[in-house]
């Protein structure tokens, strides 16, 4: 599972959105969730999101990797 924590006012988030959508289209084995931190503050708090964009990779219900800041597609794929 790849979670993308973002907000509409965040310029780096807008750079990551098309990359995450591309990965979702190409990698059907990966579930992708996009969480707007303004609309879901409780969920952002649960994941201790301090800055955005933040990408979280989960396996078997546990966080295995969490990174903040815009990342190129290659770096995101390497996280998976």
Give names to the regions the model predicted:
Residues 15-35, 39-41:
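Conserved helix-turn-beta segment immediately C-terminal to the redox Cys motif
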Residues 45-50:
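A short glycine-leucine-enriched loop at secondary-structure breakpoints
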Residues 5-19:
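Conserved redox-active cysteine motifs that mediate thiol-disulfide chemistry
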Residues 40-43, 74:
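Short loop/turn elements that flank and shape the SAM/SAH-binding pocket of Class I
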Residues 5, 34-35, 67:
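Structural motif
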Residues 2-3, 32, 55:
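Hydrophobic beta-strand anchors of alpha/beta hydrolase catalytic cores
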Residues 51, 56-80:
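Non-catalytic, surface beta->alpha helical segment in thiol-disulfide oxidoreductase systems
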């Amino acid at each position: 599972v790849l979670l993308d924590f973002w907000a509409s006012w965040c310029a780096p988030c807008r750079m990551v959105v098309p990359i995450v959508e591309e990965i979702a289209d190409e990698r059907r084995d990966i579930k992708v969730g996009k969480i707007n931190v303004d609309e879901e503050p409780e969920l952002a708090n649960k994941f201790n999101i301090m800055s955005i964009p933040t990408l979280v990779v989960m396996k078997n219900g546990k966080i295995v990797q969490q990174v903040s800041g815009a990342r190129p597609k290659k770096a995101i794929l390497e996280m998976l």
